[in-house]
């Protein structure tokens, strides 16, 4: 899957998870500071990503997530290691 398609799907997941406009979501967006996700939102996001993309985040990966780009990078690496 192309990186841009991963990003677009992640934006759709984020729009469903929290009240945020698509234009506000960039690769550099900080999930907590820019998009105002709280800890429950982050759990919902992780579960949705796992379901849509068919993999489970490792504990280490979850700790590394700060920005939208971080999530895209992890999705991409998991898709290509299958």
From Swiss-Prot:
Report a single Gene Ontology molecular function: acyl binding
Ranges where the Carrier domain occurs: 4-79
This protein's pathway: Lipid metabolism; fatty acid biosynthesis
Q: Which residues carry this modification: O-(pantetheine 4'-phosphoryl)serine?
A: 39
Please list the GO biological process terms of this entry: lipid A biosynthetic process
Instruction: Please verify whether the record's keywords include Oxidoreductase.
Output: no
- What is one GO cellular-component annotation here? cytosol
- List the keywords (alphabetical): Cytoplasm, Fatty acid biosynthesis, Fatty acid metabolism, Lipid biosynthesis, Lipid metabolism, Phosphopantetheine, Phosphoprotein
InterPro entries per UniProt = ACP, ACP-like_sf, PP-bd_ACP
A family per Pfam = PP-binding
Q: List the disulfide bonds.
A: none
Q: Where in the cell is it found?
A: Cytoplasm
PTM field: 4'-phosphopantetheine is transferred from CoA to a specific serine of apo-ACP by AcpS. This modification is essential for activity because fatty acids are bound in thioester linkage to the sulfhydryl of the prosthetic group.
The protein's job, in short, is: Carrier of the growing fatty acid chain in fatty acid biosynthesis.
Q: Which family does it belong to?
A: Belongs to the acyl carrier protein (ACP) family.
Q: Which NCBIfam families match?
A: PRK00982.1-2 (NF002148)
Its recorded name reads: Acyl carrier protein
Q: Which lineage is the organism of this entry classified under, starting from the top rank?
A: Bacteria, Pseudomonadati, Coprothermobacterota, Coprothermobacteria, Coprothermobacterales
Gene that specifies this protein: acpP
